[in-house]
Amino acid sequence: MASSSDRTAAAYPLLLLLLLSSSPLPCSASAADSGRLFPAGVQYEYESTTTVLAGGSSDNRDPAIGHRVVGRLLVANIWPATDTAGDKLLMLHFKSPKLQTWSKKSKNDVNRQFIDRKSRIDRFSDQPFFAHWRNGHIENLYVSSTNSLTEENFKKGIAGLFQFQLSNQHAVEYSTLGECNVTYSKINQNIVSKLVDGCVLPTTLPPEIKHPDKIWQGTLRSKREGLVKYNHESLVDVSLDEYHEFSTSFMNEVGASVSSKQHIELKETKPNDDVIKANTFKEAIHQLEKQLKLKLEKQNLSLKHEVKNCKHYNSCNKLDEVVYNYHDSLLDSELGKSKSAYGAIKVVDAIVNSDTKTIKKVLTDEKNEDIIVQLYDLLGAALNENSHKASMETLDFTNAKSVEKIERYLWSASINFNPKIEIIKSLLAITDENLASKKIADTLFNTVTAMASRLARYNHTDTNILLSGELVVKTLEKLEKCKLDDDECILTYIRALSNLKHPLSIEVLLSFAQHGNRKTSAYAMKTIKMFGPGLWDSRVLKYCNRIFFQLVKEQDSSTRTIALAILLESNPDYDLLKHVVEWLAAPGEEYEIKQYALELLKEMANQNETSARLLRTVLVRERLNHYGSMAQRGLSSCFSRKFINYNNITGLVKNSQQIYSGVTKRGSVDIVLEHDSVKYDLCSFGMFTTGLGYFTSLYDDSGKKDTSDEANLPATAGLELIVFGVHIRPFIMFSSQGQLMGHVWAGTGSDKTPIIQGISQMIEHLEYVPLSNGITAELNVKGMLSLDISGQIEMSLWNKNAQSVIEKNGGVSIQGSLKLDTDLVTDEVDFSLITEGLLHMHSDAEFATKIVLCMRIVFVDTNVTTIVSKSEKVHGLPHKSHTTTTRTHPVSGRTFALNQMVNEFCNTIHSR
């Protein structure tokens, strides 16, 4: 909620416009007023102060750092135009410049004093510069050669203060800020306010990098306003204030801010005899060059930007040294922790600034053998020309021993939101080669499709869209060539279609969903659900209706429940809800699918109030609100629980467990963020099993014999993972009864065993904020996720019980900086967020006489640590000021309730 001061500031220009709208001055009057200012033959001396302060976000109360430049500004109109008073040639001369910073003796903001510092500002040329001023606009500057871009941009900032209008009006102005909309409001006879917004950045700035998903961009709030005071012939006082604040979407206090204040105040007026007599402006400039014996360069007010990264200063950290310093952070034991995510950012930065030879040297160094797969993670995160070339020259796609390194590189690359098209094409070429294993072929093709889809979404050019479309066609062709009984081949390309998310694939997926076998139909239906409501047209909903109610043929229960989930998330009508509830009350269906369908109805009602009201109406009108329909007896569950609700972000844990024979047939735990009514899928961890029919007689006491295909399927269990919308190939734990019993007798899973590990980049943000004073603020943010999903299971055939735990551990580090880098001084604010998300799923089962199954989902206690560091370096001086503030915010854990039957089972087991 905005503060009262924020609301007052926002309403102030509007209030002025309302008060003054009764007597507006026409534009011609404004031109006449401004035309009488700065008559020829008079010199005006101003006291000039330009202040720049940088600090943390507004929620961070620590003192800011900053500097200011003070001096005297001489202004004179040296050309009395004969044709119109609207044209002037202003001479601007900045004299006696001084750089000032805060005194170290000052301990707080109230009493802080600026003091003079020795600096390179003494090297500024003592030459005037000239502005072509026309009716309140600076058309061009005429400047002699300067010693630095800092000086040149500073002069443009000074000249920008002389852009003004003296009546109520809207104008478009070009300045150091770019092309901006400016609103002028007359406060009284001699004061005009100025409000600047809607700026389009100058084309002279480098390209920016912004994630297509708003939640990963963060928020930049800007405000620019000024005052112009004048008398009958000159400006008396001009000020222009601006404030910019960036914060991450996750925590307002993690970010940085910069403020700038330009101020000139008239101190003295004296005669000026240096007047040029010329008939035209061009002739006046020519005479001026002769008189000063200088060559004047014509410029506009756009900033000239110089990239001042570590390469500019020849100070880049050497990759081998950075890897050595953060070696222990990248060990397997640190995965899933914030320590590895923090170190990963440092290593990725070093990789980006390294050549191919240097990267290969680090990869082949024996000292890095224990972190080699993590290094390939980071090469995939960096994903530039050099890192990709080094990876391709050190990875052997024909060697089965390289599978882990290859997959880790490809998984990390597939999540990168801004891949290069050249890299995608190079990987695409490898897909047609003879590869070492089906795992590599699966991962490689899915990586290419995921990267192409992300590129087309991020950079919506014809070339990128064409590549994505070509891959859709290629994937469909490969899918068509798969044998009907080759599920592995079919599923590989269905996963590729899920990564591409293209409407062209809908028809094929619907066909597999309705006519495929139990495995392919469920995957096809799940892929359609992943596409989201944007692609669920009437045709999709029609197929879902047929599949759920089995109007064409008998369908797999997983396929049916996914189809029902799509229907219920598509604003269902009265008739659909009526038919679903009637189906719940009808006999003949296996009760676990009914339990799951009931859970879906409850979840729909929790998430959508309109659908909830409609469901209540159906239950009352159709007299269906009774035990037979609304009180099923199964263990299946489907629910979502909030684990965070902060800063307009809602974090949800979504759990889905479809039970068959007392065992999870298909389940998933999803982590979802909601921001500004948009959902972002962070991670989905799924599990599937078949053929564990041994438990049926213990679980189902109804006496009915299972006649479905489920009972005759081989014993299988596997895991599947979706990270940031990218489908990773599944991991098969066992695929036969023999393998299962081998694990049981050997106790394979009794120790904690990694399922999937890796480090990937989730945030990359580069933004430039030009200031009115001529300085450009550079905002750079990176975020890494270190993931470790591990499992452990213990089973006793003697005691007939089992315990298992699956841990999803994610370490997150977000590091950013706001830098104001000039030849005089560098001000920098570094901010970071460090945290860990630990989500554990516990299961306890007893199956001596009857199955008792207790499942718990636990969000473990954790901390969120924020760090803000501020530093200032005056170039040419040895000292550098530096302050750091660290805060830790505890986050309480919680255990999420499932359904009533599971709770009763938990009470039974834990009471013994």
List PLM regions with ranges.
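Non-catalytic protein-protein interaction scaffold segments in large eukaryotic complex-forming proteins
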Residues: 306-394, 400-403
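Classical eukaryotic N-terminal signal peptides for Sec-dependent ER targeting/secretion
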Residues: 1-17, 23-25
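Short inter-helical turns and helix N-cap capping residues of alpha-solenoid HEAT/ARM repeat scaffolds
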Residues: 367-370, 399-403, 436-437, 485-486, ...
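Helix-rich alpha-solenoid scaffolding regions
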Residues: 363-457, 464-470
